[in-house]
Regions:
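Conserved acetyl-CoA-binding loop-helix of GNAT-fold acetyltransferases
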Residues: 94-107, 131, 135
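Conserved acetyl-CoA-binding loop of GNAT-fold acetyltransferases
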Residues: 133-143
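Conserved beta-strand-loop-alpha-helix junction that forms the acyl-donor binding cleft
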Residues: 118-130, 146-148
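Acetyl-CoA-dependent GNAT
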Residues: 3-4, 8-91, 104, 108-112, ...
C-alpha cells in the first residue's frame, strides 16, 4: 500500500467501479458495487460512495451512511452514521486498504459532527468480515439489522 486515497465515483471511473470484484468466497457477505451505487442514487441524502485508489489502480469501494435510523418507528432509535459497504478487490486484501477505508469513513463522520460512534453491520459466517471489524475496535451491540450483526466503534477510542 503506497498512497491510498478516496475518489468520488465519476463518469470516467464508473465502469471500473462496477467491474470491481471481491474474492469469490466473499461474495455472499457483501453486495456488488453496482447495487451499492443504485442504493447511493436512491438514498443520495445519506449515502457517501467512494472508490479506493492506490496510485492509478482501483483497489476497492467504500460507502458510508450518515444520520439514518435503523428503526424509525421506535421513538428511542437514534440517528446513526457508519460504514454501509466495503469491497476490497480480489488480490488486494490484506494490504491495509480496508483499514484505510474504515479510518477515512471514521474521519468523515468526525468531520461532520454530531455522532459519538461509528456503526457497521456484517453478515455472520466463516470467512466473513467480523474478525476484521473486531480487530479495528468495533464491538457487537447485541442488535440485528435485518439478518446482520450491528457493531459500533466509539469515536473517542479512535
Amino acid at each position: 500500500m503506497a498512497n491510498p486515497r478516496l475518489e468520488k465515483v465519476t463518469a470516467e471511473n464508473i465502469d471500473a467501479a462496477i467491474a470491481l470484484k471481491v474474492r469469490p468466497d466473499q461474495e455472499r457477505f457483501v453486495a456488488p458495487v453496482v447495487k451499492s451505487l443504485a442504493e447511493a442514487y436512491v438514498h443520495s441524502e445519506t449515502a457517501w460512495p467512494r472508490l479506493i485508489f492506490d496510485g492509478e489502480e482501483l483497489v476497492g469501494f467504500v460507502m458510508a451512511f450518515f444520520e439514518i435510523r435503523f428503526n424509525p418507528e421506535d421513538p428511542d432509535d437514534r440517528p446513526r452514521s457508519g460504514l454501509w459497504r466495503l469491497n476490497i478487490a480480489d488480490g488486494r486484501q490484506g494490504r491495509g486498504y480496508g483499514r484505510f477505508a474504515v479510518e477515512a469513513v471514521t474521519e468523515e463522520i468526525r468531520r461532520r459532527g454530531g455522532q459519538k460512534r461509528v456503526t457497521v453491520t456484517w453478515a455472520e459466517g466463516e470467512g466473513g468480515p467480523e474478525e476484521f471489524y473486531l480487530r479495528l475496535g468495533f464491538r457487537r451491540t447485541g442488535e440485528l439489522s435485518g439478518d446482520q450483526v450491528v457493531g459500533e466503534l466509539d469515536l473517542k477510542d479512535t
